[in-house]
Design a protein with these regions (language model features):
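Jelly-roll (double-stranded beta-helix
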Residues: 1-158
Length: 158
């Protein structure tokens, strides 16, 4: 029998969720709970779509998969994993509040409307080593980044 575990953390201005399964799992999410703007898959593959529709997002992950899921807000969705999977969701707290999201590839200029989140690994940012699920509100300054093969996202409130 396959197992599926879901975790949720409400942060100051957003929420994070994480899903971990050993594969071959189907998960359904009700429209009233669908606040995920971005999905970050760090392990595994699967597909996701609106229930009873033919169009799916298929994620075949050899590295990392970052998906904009805004079109799924307010819709019933279904996710099927093809193999063991570990993924995160960046969620808005208010469906009327939009965010821009991206994975960083190196050093960058921050701003005070943004948050940084570590999804995998142990990057060093401005001399501080981060762990998985560490997050911080950014300031209007330069951030020196050594990724060390980590996966780090920056999300900006629009």
């Amino acid at each position: 029998m396959s197992s599926f575990h879901r975790y949720f953390k409400k942060c100051e201005e957003f929420a994070l969720c994480a899903e971990v399964s050993d594969g071959n799992v189907v998960e359904v999410e009700d429209a009233s709970e669908r606040y995920t703007l971005y999905q970050i898959v760090v392990k595994g593959s699967g597909r996701m779509g609106k229930i009873f529709e033919n169009d799916y997002i298929v994620g075949d992950v050899n590295g990392v998969y970052f998906a904009d899921l805004k079109e799924y807000l307010g819709h019933h969705t279904v996710f099927e994993s093809f193999e063991p999977v570990h993924m995160y969701g960046f969620n808005t707290l208010d469906l009327n509040q939009d965010w821009d999201g991206k994975l960083i590839e190196g050093s960058f200029q921050g701003d005070d409307k943004s948050w940084l989140i570590c999804f995998k690994g142990n990057p060093t940012i401005n001399g501080k080593e981060l762990r998985v699920m560490d997050y911080a509100k950014l300031e209007n300054k330069h951030y020196d980044v050594q990724l060390n093969d980590a996966i780090v996202g920056v999300f900006t409130k629009l």
